[in-house]
Amino acid sequence: MSGTSQVLQNDSHQSQHASMAYNQRQPMMYPPPPQQQPLHSQNSLPPLPPIPAPSLPPISNNISNGNTNELNNNNQQQQQHGQPPLPPPPINANQQYYAVPPLRAPPPLNTLSSVVNSLPTLTPTLTNATHSTMSSNSSAESSASSSSNSITKPKSKRSSKGRVFQCTGYPGCNMSFTRSEHLARHKRKHTGERPFTCPYCSKNFSRLDNLRQHKQTVHAYETYLTKDNRDSKLLIERSKSKKKLKQQEKKAQQQAQLQAQAQAQAQAQVHMQQHQQNGYNFQPPYPQFHNQYYANNQYQGPQPPPPPAPQQQVPGQQQPQPQQGMPAGYLDPYRQYPPNTTFDPMALPPPPKINAHPQKPLPPLPHQMGGGQEQPSDNVSQQGLKIPDHAFTPKRRPEPLALQHSTHSNENISNEGNINANTNTNMNTVTSSITSDAVYPPPPRSATSAASLTPNLASPLSPLFHQSFSQTTLKSTPDPRGSTITNSSISIKSPMSQHFSILSGNSNYSNNTTNSLPSVSNLPHPNWGSTNGTTGSNGTSGGSYQQNSFHQRQSSVVSDFSIFSNSDNRKDIKSNWLKGVLNDDNNNNNNNNNEQQQQQLQDPKLASPAPTLPPVSSITGGGTSNGNDSMMVDNMENKNDVSQSNVIIDSNNNNGDKMVNKLNFQSIELHDNNNNNTPSIKSTHSTETIQTTMVVVNKSDPPPLSTPTTNTNTNTNSTATTNATGYVSKKPTINNLISQ
């Protein structure tokens, strides 16, 4: 034993020296683990080889487990057989990563023995880890299977627990219920029974909850009204009675159809037998047609059976037969028989009788014999469309109201047409594309110039606008600076009524109390004040005024049109007013015509002598201040009085027609100063009635020479006297009434 121990000690010393030398050669390498030391067990077994486990790469647990098992087996064999230990394996450079940290001193033998004894315990830990993973997987699978089993098991328990009532008698249905009511409700699905009926619409339901839901949703209003049980019971009874009636009607219809079909077949057979006995080859179309007829008309009501006894039929009763839709050509072979023969169903067929009415060769239906002859026609009429008794009268849009001026009357319009027809023959007309008959005056360029004078605000382009102003165009030729005459029912508050003169000649021809509104043609040129002032101050003639007005009409857009006292010039303007707007070359011709007519007015030789009018004093009973035959106006009271209702015009123009009218509705004073050419206007209003004195010139006569006598003063007011041909109204003026 001592020898063996010495050998072991020597070996251990050698191994220590070798390890130290190896460590000196490779300082980076660590010494081998302490497991390389010889094991001093109680039996003095040879030392164990070094454990290669830490030097191997971690490839897999199985390989390490196999190596450890082999090492353990080798150690056991060495311990049993006493073989010498194997030399330690050489350490390669690849094993640097797996080197164990160096130990300063070799461990004692006790620790080595404890480590060797602990080695077998390392391998089970690895195997336990692998087994634990495997066991975890298997446990998961087992838990899943157990959970699936636990899910299926409660179902089976639920289905079996307390579900005594099973649905039997219907293959493929394994339903079971806990209550018999549920089973009965389920069986209604198989049987299709619907015992619950809606009392309002007679709809059937298999479940009571469905009926309640139907009532609450569809018949919510009815259920709210019929909360009382009595009402609901009445409704239910009514619905039941309705159902019974419907069922009875259906049954009756079906029975009637069956009876009619049977009767038709029997009668068809009788007819066929009769034809065969008499030698007629009458084949199936007749019975087949009736079978189809009744099959297609099953919805018709019950029809009375034909009487068994034969009866005669009048030929006139066959008139509704063409409505049956039967073919009309299959009875042609029977037309050779004599007419007016009676029909006997047991003796002869009906075709000879049909010859009386060749246009309606259809035979009677079999059920029409006897009392049932007129019923099919009624049924056929019910099948067609029903024609309404009353004729369809669509609603018509009301016609637009004939807008007529407020001051017009039918008499004035009719008289106006006659007057226009008479005056148009005496005028030299100029054709125009717009106004061919030249009845209406030309409309102004702007509607604002005359819109304030029309209460209804008619459009200047509408014929109503022309009708309202066309009466005075052919009756009077006023001067643009005449006085204003208005209607008593209309108050003119526009600025035009204060500046310009408007004349209405209705009162001269008829004693109408309602005078029509003035004509558009009487409206003066808007710029007449400035031209009047310039011509008055310069002392020029009336021709220059008219030429200036034409020039303004061509150049100015605001100006309306110029007005002349002669009817020929007025006619030219009416026909060519649009050309004047478009700056046509015809305006030069108009200027030449105007110059010629002004020369006629200025030259007394070219014009016919104007007859004189009786003085106003002889008409009204008053006196005049002058002894001339012209109409004079007393102006002694008007020199210093501004509020008195007179119209006083100061002018230096010696040519042109002058008319003086007296107003108390609007009194206007126009003062003409030499320094300022624009007239000053002062107006006052009063509530007295209108009294007018008017002079109208006949347009049928040639243009007269008007020689007015004018008293002009530079600082005081003066009045104009006018000589003209025509009629003078006999209404007294206000001044004459005051003077009396």
UniProtKB/Swiss-Prot annotation:
Question: Which UniProt keywords are present, listed alphabetically?
Answer: Metal-binding, Nucleus, Phosphoprotein, Repeat, Transcription, Transcription regulation, Zinc, Zinc-finger
Single biological process term from Gene Ontology: negative regulation of filamentous growth of a population of unicellular organisms in response to pH
User: Ranges of Pro residues compositional bias?
Assistant: 46-57
Coarse class of the primary localization is nucleus
UniProt region (Disordered), positions on chain: 1-105, 126-164, 269-385, 404-454, 472-491, 513-552, 579-644, 698-726
- Residue ranges covered by zinc fingers (C2H2-type): 165-190, 196-219
PTM sites of type Phosphothreonine? 191
On induction, the UniProt comment says:
Expression is under the positive control of the hyphal regulator TEC1 and repressed by TUP1. Also induced by acetic acid-stress in a MNL1-dependent manner.
The entry summarizes the disruption phenotype as follows: Produces poor biofilms and decreases infection on rat denture models. Increases phagocytosis of the fungus by host cells in presence of estrogen. Decreases expression of GPD2.
Q: Which domain of life is it from?
A: Eukaryota
Q: Where is the composition biased (Low complexity)?
A: 58-83, 126-150, 291-301, 311-328, 409-436, 529-538, 583-603, 707-725
Give the multimer and partner information.
Interacts with CBK1.
Q: What is the name attached to this protein's record?
A: Biofilm and cell wall regulator 1
Question: Which source organism does the UniProt entry give?
Answer: Candida albicans (strain SC5314 / ATCC MYA-2876) (Yeast)
